[in-house]
Amino acid sequence: MAGHLVKYGKHRTRRSYARIKEVLDLPNLIEIQTDSYQWFLDEGLREMFEDIMPIDDFAGKLSLEFVDYQLLEPKYTVEEAREHDANYSAPLHVTLRLTNHETGEIKSQDVFFGDFPLMTEQGTFIINGAERVIVSQLVRSPGVYFNEELDKNGRPSYGTTVIPNRGAWLELETDAKNVSYVRIDRTRKIPLTELVRALGYGSDDDIIDMLGETDSLMLTLEKDVHKNTDDSRVEESLKDIYERLRPGEPKTADSSRSLLTARFFDPKRYDFAPVGRYKVNKKLSMKTRLMDQTLAETLADPDTGEVIAQKDTVIDKNVMAKLSPYLERDDFKTVTYTPSDEAVVTNPMVLQVVKVYSQNDPEKVVNVIGNGNIDLKFKHIVPADIIASINYFFNLQEGLGSTDDIDHLGNRRIRSVGELLQNQFRIGLSRMERVVRERMSIQDAATVTPQQLINIRPVVASIKEFFGSSQLSQFMDQTNPLGELTHKRRLSALGPGGLTRDRAGYEVRDVHYTHYGRMCPIETPEGPNIGLINSLSSYAKVNRSGFIETPYRRVDWTTHKVTDKIDYLAADEEDQFVIAQANSPLNDDGSFVEDTVLARNKEENLETPIENVDYMDVSPKQVVAVATACIPFLENDDSNRALMGANMQRQAVPLLDPHAPLIGTGIEYKAAHDSGIALICRHEGTVEYVDAREVRVRRDDGSLDTYKLMKFRRSNGGKNYNQRPIVKVGDHVDNDEVLADGPAMEGGELALGQNPLVAFMTWNGYNFEDAIIINERLVREDVYTSIHIEEYESEARDTKLGPEEMTREIPNVGEDALKNLDEDGIIRIGAEVKDGDILVGKVTPKGVTELSAEERLLHAIFGEKAREVRDTSLRVPHGGGGIIQDVKIFTRENGDELSPGVNMMVRVYIAQKRKIQVGDKMAGRHGNKGTVSIVVPEEDMPYMPDGTPIDIMLSPMGVPSRMNIGQVLELHLGMAARKLGIHMATPVFDGAQDTDIWEAIREAGVDSDAKSIVYDGRTGEPFDKRVAVGVMHYMKLSHMVDDKIHARSIGPYSLVTQQPLGGKAQFGGQRFGEMEVWALEAYGAAYTLQEILTYKSDDVVGRVKTYEAIVKGEPIPKPGVPESFRVLVKELQALGLDMKVLDSEDKEIELRDMDDDDDEVVNVDALSKFKQQQDEKAADKAAKADAAKPSETTNAQQDNQ
């Protein structure tokens, strides 16, 4: 028997067909969220305060310093925050110290800085009672980038861009004549030498001495002539730059100096961030640039004079190993340049310079200039960076160095929650800083306290704005646990500071070789966001700099054995190594079986001797994301269909009684465990008590832990989230074990669907175009039944005419409609409601008109009751009927926080039990989706030789052209698993081979071709051909026909055109468009067409009269002029065109004006009014009938006596 048994948690054992030993467990799948937020609380916040503070006033008398901060206990627990529509947040208190430099007085004070949202254990935030996720953003890393473009003559031209985290961009480029220019912050271009002069190196000789003689530099110097001899070259360049940046303003050297300092050399305005400084140093460092170059000078030890490398040596790995320690020193091959006193930055500049031969002309000597190992604490750019970048730029023209690929994941980084929050917090703090400065100068220095200086509004506002309305703060996808998990692991290239859909080209969206093990090449949405929204691969982690790293097993260089030592490599580090695939065969001691292996290096796949291999993949599934890793036989599916399969698993609806897949991939347990939906044990112990609401565990030290289960909670997606215990009293449970299944879980594993018996066969054409035929048993036995909970709310507000009132005394409503309401007019829990039923009775005061004498008298006698009220009750919308599951009442008296003007709020939850029905969408895990076309009685379904009816029939046409053969393999292996009564695991890229499948089929006693004779349930005759029948994991998706079906009778109209609105949410009509009109014209159906374009659309007068005529049973009147025609005429008249409408006798037809709207007949609400009058009449009749009944009964009683 192939395969071996593996335990997944305590409740499931599977036969796994994996051949590759797992050397590394999957990491915690939501740590990208939790770790990042923890970093923010521990370090990120402090960093921000230390960046902004101390704040000094303009005169330098006062300074405000940051001492410390602390987060206190949250005001609400997670559950309470959900209940009260509040935020789950904790108050932030900051200790500040105010120093008065004149008197030396120091005041310390604790200042409240607003409530700060906290992350729940599941990696989400609760904002206004709703769970939200902050999606990580994929952005270009700050650094220096070199690119190459071909001009129209086919000659390469190079460009350089220095991109900071915050601040002005610096770009270098050459034109067609090979003259080099610089652009500052996307403005007009300036000759490159002007920037060098502005840095304090004014003469041509200085520049040539520093940068060496290159063609482009000499041409640029010719172009850059000394125009105004009154100024020195440095001052002239400064003024030129100022003129380009601020055209039209008076230019002086001083103003230019301060402008350039502010643009580039002020740490508060220009910031590379540590990651940017690391990238710049790496790109401009001598180590990377000297590799494979030929030295044009002899390099010697500066202390001893010992030769390290002779002239004409080609620098390879071995020479670099000797040279490396010297290049890191501050005194090796360094040249110090002192700028003139007029320069922007007057400090001396230290560069490392080594002479090498040009690649294009081996006789020519070229300077390679490094930026001199700048300390990582310099977050802003320094002149050495600019000079080294210019040198790299010129070296590219000599064939030295390499251009950058901006889609390489070494040049794109992740901004996770912590950093996004930090950036937002910085915005708030810098706005606050301005206010503090102003207040310092206004208030009395002797008496002022930190509390009086600080205004926390901008900080609170910026945080609120980020969580409430940022593109990256998203309403969590809560359809099932996999959807939640994927949402937390999502990477988006959109959002502030990222790309936009329209501008993103093909390259950005494409799969790049560096995605391997970092971002899933399969899971991405279809449509305009394809490739811009990605998912983190299963083993990937994000490092401190924000680059995605993936783990590899180290290969020992001397023995060439694969060790269990794991290294996490970022994309740019990985480029230096040769990496073998995870499925390379190994001996028991870790040595490779074969002498050559398949391996990767950069974008090449090569067959290479094992001596060259540096690393080996950890696992075959490290390439893909969690959702993709849930697809068995992924390797047999076409990638487009696998993409659909991965995306559709997230849309599976949690069923009443789910079952984990018979054929899994072994990741189901980990996915369910880390999603945060299962109930996890925190300390080991023994289960002491279990019921549906709580589990109690007695720890080994004697203390008791109580775990509350989540019962029938409405999720973000309107699904039913419910937990069920899976442990028994007396069980010993370990730390981190699953105590209770969440929605779409079974036995601690993900269970998105069921395992029905599936046949690939046609049946009377009912599975044409991917339609699905299902057995009535699936409906009757609630196999695909799910519970959906919808929330409705009603508020009683104060209006201008008086407060609204919740009551059961509603005008014109019979007693029958009120039977389930309590004395306050609120529906009881457990009542069954249909469309249009009242949930909360509410009346709103109407406008009071002048009362007549009789009405005044009645008013005086009966008090308020005679006042006019309008019925504004909350009713069940179309398709919303079900059973009242819960009612929550919030009032001011109970201390609930309500928005201003609201006196009372009622929330009603309606649960619906939805069975599978015609029109529902279903799918497997291989992108094989379809809608249910017919539900066939069990006795009519085809059946197997043993009498088992088939549950689902799929069209065999759906397989060949789509190339998702994985579903067929799953079907056959599933049949074997069903017969053997076991669960199986076939991990992606390392699963069951065809030999394993055939062996399992033989073992299970299924026919050798894995097909079966199938009999027609209606006639009992066998079908001609043998049919593939087996078990496939099939899901019901959240696109249900109940949510989409919709029919309009009388509904709202658009205000201007008076045509019916569109869409289910607006209770709109179906658009009868241009092409539909052609169809009726082609048939000559003139009257049908006329009524569609008039009564049924926007003939305002006509439709009211028609409604009346139908109600009264009179003939329908002639149609009038459609409103949209009148709108067109009015628009033309507004343009000043004299436009009239004439009839056949050339008489003008009067078009009604908007001012005529007082006329009852043509009012927009006329139909509703008419309907209301009819309803009132009917209600009166009903009331009279009710009144008549009791008197009859009393008469009858008298007769009996």
Curated annotation (Swiss-Prot):
Annotated EC: 2.7.7.6
Principal EC category: transferase
Biased composition (Basic and acidic residues): 1172-1189
Record gene name: rpoB
GO biological process: DNA-templated transcription
Annotated disulfide bonds: none
CDD domains: RNA_pol_B_RPB2
Family named by the database record: Belongs to the RNA polymerase beta chain family.
Taxonomy, superkingdom: Bacteria
One GO MF term: ribonucleoside binding
InterPro entries associated with the record: DNA-dir_RNA_pol_bsu_ext_1_sf, DNA-dir_RNA_pol_bsu_external_1, DNA-dir_RNA_pol_su2, DNA-dir_RNAP_su2_dom, DNA-dir_RNAP_su2_hyb_sf, RNA_pol_bsu_bac, RNA_pol_bsu_CS, RNA_pol_bsu_protrusion
Name of protein: DNA-directed RNA polymerase subunit beta
Extent of the signal sequence: none
Chain's role: DNA-dependent RNA polymerase catalyzes the transcription of DNA into RNA using the four ribonucleoside triphosphates as substrates.
Keyword field contains Nucleotidyltransferase: yes
Catalytic activity, reaction form: RNA(n) + a ribonucleoside 5'-triphosphate = RNA(n+1) + diphosphate
Family annotation (Pfam families): RNA_pol_Rpb2_1, RNA_pol_Rpb2_2, RNA_pol_Rpb2_3, RNA_pol_Rpb2_45, RNA_pol_Rpb2_6, RNA_pol_Rpb2_7
Keyword list, A-Z: DNA-directed RNA polymerase, Nucleotidyltransferase, Transcription, Transferase
Quaternary structure, from the entry: The RNAP catalytic core consists of 2 alpha, 1 beta, 1 beta' and 1 omega subunit. When a sigma factor is associated with the core the holoenzyme is formed, which can initiate transcription.
Region named Disordered: 1165-1201
Biased composition (Polar residues): 1191-1201
A Gene Ontology term for the protein's cellular component: DNA-directed RNA polymerase complex
